[in-house]
């Protein structure tokens, strides 16, 4: 049985890498550090850092904290968090992902220009909470591209100028499906960009938004900006190919991970013999037995952008030692 470890489309993204690196440096220096929320949506990695001295706190605890240092994770935070920090004399170590920080700026400018901001994402995801905070929490969050959730679309003002953006880790096809359905919905209520045949919304760039904000040419009434992180979305096709190339897939990620859910579904669609775990104690021996009763020929180990590479190596090592490995893979 060959064990193949995916190093090209699995493991921490750049934003999470930066956060973990800073957290480790701070902990090495002082042995203690507060983190607002889980530093990453991976329980195993959180426990590793907590063992080094990190303390994870929630918003109520953060609001009671005084004169301490607090890490802001890659997901980012709304303006209210920074206001609390100033009020409570808290030193903020801000590791917001640059892609997320740029998106927050875009959301803020669109809101200031009077746009109703629609966010394709998950309402309680910390990144979305941070983005919506830039809109005074007035953004409309939609998770279902088919507009099937009436509660999600109920707040929409179909006569107002509107901009569509996205949580950085959502799926690209879903974003464009949502755009298409919003175009149809708004057009049915008589709101479309002048000169468009079927109510197409117009793509805008940062320079367009900045220009209007500084008194330049006005943007169309109905616009969209694809803000999905391409470093994340580019993994989709690679991971699909990886899943197809192996008899069995063991996908390691935290169950809180939004990206993990998306990537696992890609693996599962490509290869029905794909299994989700958080750690090695969930691995089952029957996964590695083929329909002929013999061991499968290959097992692929992969994970999410929030999965540390050391955990994937641990999984490969465990499977290799427990069930056998003839690939010559040094990680197994």
Swiss-Prot record:
Binds 1 [4Fe-4S] cluster per subunit. Pathway: Isoprenoid biosynthesis; dimethylallyl diphosphate biosynthesis; dimethylallyl diphosphate from (2E)-4-hydroxy-3-methylbutenyl diphosphate: step 1/1; Isoprenoid biosynthesis; isopentenyl diphosphate biosynthesis via DXP pathway; isopentenyl diphosphate from 1-deoxy-D-xylulose 5-phosphate: step 6/6. InterPro entries: LytB/IspH. The keyword Iron applies. Gene3D superfamilies: 3.40.50.11270, 4-hydroxy-3-methylbut-2-enyl diphosphate reductase, catalytic domain (3.40.1010.20). GO terms for biological process: dimethylallyl diphosphate biosynthetic process; isopentenyl diphosphate biosynthetic process, methylerythritol 4-phosphate pathway; terpenoid biosynthetic process. Keywords: 4Fe-4S, Iron, Iron-sulfur, Isoprene biosynthesis, Metal-binding, Oxidoreductase. (2E)-4-hydroxy-3-methylbut-2-enyl diphosphate binds at residues 41, 75, 125, 168, 257-259, 306. Isopentenyl diphosphate binds at residues 41, 75, 125, 257-259, 306. Dimethylallyl diphosphate binds at residues 41, 75, 125, 257-259, 306. GO terms for molecular function: 4 iron, 4 sulfur cluster binding; 4-hydroxy-3-methylbut-2-enyl diphosphate reductase activity; metal ion binding. Its cofactor is [4Fe-4S] cluster. It holds the Pfam family LYTB. The active site is at residue 127. It is an enzyme of class 1 (oxidoreductase). Its EC number is 1.17.7.4. It catalyses: isopentenyl diphosphate + 2 oxidized [2Fe-2S]-[ferredoxin] + H2O = (2E)-4-hydroxy-3-methylbut-2-enyl diphosphate + 2 reduced [2Fe-2S]-[ferredoxin] + 2 H(+); dimethylallyl diphosphate + 2 oxidized [2Fe-2S]-[ferredoxin] + H2O = (2E)-4-hydroxy-3-methylbut-2-enyl diphosphate + 2 reduced [2Fe-2S]-[ferredoxin] + 2 H(+). [4Fe-4S] cluster binds at residues 13, 97, 229. Belongs to the IspH family. Catalyzes the conversion of 1-hydroxy-2-methyl-2-(E)-butenyl 4-diphosphate (HMBPP) into a mixture of isopentenyl diphosphate (IPP) and dimethylallyl diphosphate (DMAPP). Acts in the terminal step of the DOXP/MEP pathway for isoprenoid precursor biosynthesis. This is 4-hydroxy-3-methylbut-2-enyl diphosphate reductase. It comes from Chlorobaculum parvum (strain DSM 263 / NCIMB 8327). The gene is ispH.
């Amino acid at each position: 049985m060959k064990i193949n470890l995916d190093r090209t489309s699995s493991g921490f993204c750049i934003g999470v890498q930066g956060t973990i690196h800073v957290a480790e440096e701070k902990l090495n220096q002082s042995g203690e550090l507060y983190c607002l929320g889980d530093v990453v949506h991976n329980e195993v990695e959180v426990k590793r850092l907590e063992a080094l001295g990190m303390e994870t706190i929630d918003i109520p605890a953060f609001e009671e904290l005084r004169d301490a240092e607090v890490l802001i994770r890659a997901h980012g935070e709304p303006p209210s968090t920074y206001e609390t920090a100033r009020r409570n004399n808290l030193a903020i170590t801000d590791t917001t992902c640059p892609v997320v920080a740029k998106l927050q700026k875009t959301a803020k400018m669109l809101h200031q220009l009077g746009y109703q901001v629609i966010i394709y994402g998950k309402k309680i995801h910390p990144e979305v909470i941070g983005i919506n905070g830039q809109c005074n929490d007035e953004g409309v969050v939609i998770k279902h591209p088919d507009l099937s959730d009436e509660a999600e679309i109920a707040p929409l003002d179909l006569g107002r100028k509107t901009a569509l953006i996205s949580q950085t880790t959502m799926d690209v096809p879903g974003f464009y499906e949502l755009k298409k359905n919003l175009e149809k919905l708004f057009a049915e209520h008589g709101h479309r960009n002048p000169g468009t045949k079927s109510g197409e919304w117009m793509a805008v760039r940062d320079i367009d938004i900045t220009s209007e904000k500084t008194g330049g040419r006005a943007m169309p009434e109905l616009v969209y900006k694809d803000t999905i992180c391409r470093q994340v979305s580019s993994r989709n096709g690679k991971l699909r190919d990886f899943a197809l190339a192996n008899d069995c897939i063991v996908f390691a990620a935290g169950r809180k991970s939004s990206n993990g859910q998306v990537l696992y579904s890609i693996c599962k669609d490509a290869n029905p013999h794909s299994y989700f775990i958080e750690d090695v104690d969930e691995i089952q021996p029957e996964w590695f037995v083929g329909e002929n009763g013999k061991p499968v020929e290959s097992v692929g180990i992969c994970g999410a952008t929030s999965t540390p590479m050391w955990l994937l190596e641990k999984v490969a090592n465990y499977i290799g030692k427990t069930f056998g490995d003839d690939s010559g893979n040094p990680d197994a």
